[in-house]
Amino acid sequence: MKEININNARSQIPSLAIVVPCYNEKDAFPYCLEGLTTILKNLLAKEKIARNSYILFVDDGSKDNTWEQIKSTSQEKSFIRGLKLSRNRGHQIALLAGLANADTDVTVSIDADLQDDIGCIEKMIDKYNEGFEIVYGVRDNRSSDSVFRLAP
């Protein structure tokens, strides 16, 4: 993680939106939901994020039942939100739609296959609280790829 701090530390607990673009993720969705829910609840318990924080799943016109899973889960859990695109527009458009719909202090994006280390979300929040405006991570290897990412 590269660091350039130009601001003072923050005193207010930030709200967080985790934006997750999804396309045909019916198999990965339950694992993604479980992992991100654990992270969100952990951050809430440590009082690192505000109670109005949430996970936003953006369905990019999936042809499987990804949207149905998102919709059902969002009706059961108040910290889950869903956004459905009318058709497949591509990962970047789904990501942009999610970022545009996030209404929080901090927004983190992550792919539904959890190929990136979700444990870094807490470190990113810590950096934000130290005063950083932009925090991003770069993987230096692919040894942590999930089984979904490695599948042919």
State what each model feature region is.
Residues 1-146:
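Structured catalytic core of nucleotide-sugar glycosyltransferases
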Residues 146-152:
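A transmembrane-helix-recognition feature enriched in membrane-embedded lipid enzymes
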